[in-house]
Amino acid sequence: MAQPGPAPQPDVSLQQRVAELEKINAEFLRAQQQLEQEFNQKRAKFKELYLAKEEDLKRQNAVLQAAQDDLGHLRTQLWEAQAEMENIKAIATVSENTKQEAIDEVKRQWREEVASLQAVMKETVRDYEHQFHLRLEQERAQWAQYRESADREIADLRRRLSEGQEEENLENEMKKAQEDAEKLRSVVMPMEKEIAALKDKLTEAEDKIKELEASKVKELNHYLEAEKSCRTDLEMYVAVLNTQKSVLQEDAEKLRKELHEVCHLLEQERQQHNQLKHTWQKANDQFLESQRLLMRDMQRMEIVLTSEQLRQVEELKKKDQEEDEQQRINKGKDNKKIDTEEEVKIPVVCALTQEESSTPLSNEEEHLDSTHGSVHSLDADLLLPSGDPFSKSDNDMFKEGLRRAQSTDSLGTSSSLQSKALGYNYKAKSAGNLDESDFGPLVGADSVSENFDTVSLGSLQMPSGFMLTKDQERAIKAMTPEQEETASLLSSVTQGMESAYVSPSGYRLVSETEWNLLQKEVHNAGNKLGRRCDMCSNYEKQLQGIQIQEAETRDQVKKLQLMLRQANDQLEKTMKEKQELEDFLRQSAEDSSHQISALVLRAQASEVLLEELQQSFSQAKRDVQEQMAVLMQSREQVSEELVRLQKDNDSLQGKHSLHVSLQLAEDFILPDTVQVLRELVLKYRENIVHVRTAADHMEEKLKAEILFLKEQIQAEQCLKENLEETLQLEIENCKEEIASISSLKAELERIKVEKGQLESTLREKSQQLESLQEIKVNLEEQLKKETAAKATVEQLMFEEKNKAQRLQTELDVSEQVQRDFVKLSQTLQVQLERIRQADSLERIRAILNDTKLTDINQLPET
């Protein structure tokens, strides 16, 4: 009972402690709120300052970027101006060099011509003086002789007088002497007058010589001026001649290439001749093999057929013969009309010789003879089958159909025409699946179905003296798939016949379906045998293509002749372009003067831009210095604000210690009960946890803010350093550019001085260019050379025409070879048909002996 008394004391102390803690907490919260408000205010100020600084930096960067763009633009303009100046310098140097060379050349030619003219004038004056001196000497000699004769007469008279003649005679002699003196005086006076007149004439002649010399000099000067004026025309004329010469040379090269191609075509044509011979050989072998297979199949079918079937075959044969006779009569009338209108057309083979080596015609003839010999040798390698003889009318109809087939453009005919015209009904089953390319051109030209007599099929044998080649024996011995099918069919039929009983006469050994199938296959084989030969049609197309190429070459020759005429017309039209060329030269001079004035204006504009660039650079420098001052001031403000924040933090720590001391000094009433104390303690603990979390959060927040401010200060410091470096670089670059601009300005002034000098020299050169047209003689020589070149080109064209004529003759020879080849093929077809129609081996031997030919001209006309 004594223990519950003192229990309320700890509760009161706890309550007091709790109250103190609540007060401390309230004070701490108030201080925290105040600090947050102050921090937010300061943060807003810092944000405003930061945004203001960012805007200032953006403006400064924009100004710097604009200044850099202006600098780049000005640099590009300066580079362009420098490039243009370099181009102008190069053009001026080139023009000066060319003008100086032209002036030197013209001076040299002028000096040569003046020296030649002076020499000519001196020679003419010397000739005139020499002639006059000769005349004067001759006249003086004549007068001296006359005076000597007169003096001799006077001396004789005086001697006579001195000899003491009689006085009478003396008077007479004196009279005679006076008369002679008068006569002499009458002769001498006109002679003196004539001498004076001759002297006057001599002076006049000398004056005329001087006048003629002066007039000749004037004429020569006028001639030189005219030559100067004609220089541009002659230059253009020579340029046109050079272009025409190049065009003619290109045409000649094209002709050479075309001739080379044509020669290549000739070589290909020769190769095709050899290939065609082998093709005919193979076609004959294939044709013989197909004929042999037809004979064997017909013999086997004869064994299979019954007497009833043979009778039906005979009836069908008679009907077909009657129809064929009627059609033959009708077609004979039509063919007579057609033969009068149409002629045999054989495509011309275009074969041209090589350009470099002109092969003689004798070599071609030898080649053709060898070709003929190789074609004739085909007769010795042919193995011809023998069949039942045709009637005489069938043989004539075959020749008529063959002649009509030759009148067309191809060597083959349709199977329906010849099968109806010749009256062949039976087809071999073994050839039912063969293509038309397996028979060659002979089958195409002789595509007819065989009409063998069923009685004599088994009695045919090969002639004893007719030998086969190895290829023919191999082709005969080898079995084709069609032969194997036929053999299997016959073996099945013969086995059926052996196993079955012997049927009475009149009954079939095969069924109706097999019989119909056999007739269809025989009909198909005959149709395929009569198809057109693809090889012949391809060969005909090749011949037509070669003929077209020949026509094209002729057209090209005509075009070249037309081009020559046009070139001559163009040569005549060149003199009409004189005024246009003068206008062009005048316009080019005006354009050059305009370009020079435009360059002067651009140089002045570049100077103005340089001054503007200097002003903008000085303005940018002042702006950068002002920005640097503003940045320094803002840095000082930030440092002052940091010092103030440190002081505030110190003051806050002092207030915290003051509040703690105040809470300790206050009275704290503890709670009365343990339950209340426990609740109060729990409440305080929760408040302490909240306060600690808030303090930690505030501490972290303040640390983050401090770090942010430090990083911001460092970034501003780095930005400031970078800005200082960039500005320093820009200042150095601007200094360099100013130095380069000053050097460019000096260069521009020097170029202006050079421009003035060039203008003065240009005026001098323009004055001197008026004397550059004194080279007509050289141009005339060039014209003569061009005319000589034209003559050589015409000679070359004449040679090309001769080559074309020679190639035409060779083309005719090759065409004749083709005709002979076709004639030989037709003869072979006729011989094959005769052998096919032969009724005995003796007849076949006689036909083979008759075919021994030594020349193509011995072939009969078909």
Swiss-Prot record:
Modified residues annotated as N-acetylalanine in this record: 2
Transmembrane regions listed in the UniProt entry: none
Subcellular location: Cytoplasm; Early endosome; Recycling endosome; Cytoplasmic vesicle
Gene: Rabep1
Modified sites of kind N6-acetyllysine: 282
Subunit structure of this chain's protein: Heterodimer with RABGEF1. The heterodimer binds RAB4A and RAB5A that have been activated by GTP-binding. Interacts with TSC2. Interacts with GGA1 (via GAE domain), GGA2 (via GAE domain) and GGA3 (via GAE domain). Interacts with AP1G1 (via GAE domain). Interacts with AP1G2 (via GAE domain). Interacts with ECPAS. Interacts with KCNH1. Interacts with PKD1 (via C-terminal domain) and GGA1; the interactions recruit PKD1:PKD2 complex to GGA1 and ARL3 at trans-Golgi network. Interacts with KCNH1.
GO CC, one annotated term: recycling endosome
Listed GO MF terms: growth factor activity; GTPase activator activity; protein domain specific binding; protein homodimerization activity
Residues modified to Phosphothreonine: 408
The protein, known as: Rab GTPase-binding effector protein 1
Source organism of this protein record: Rattus norvegicus
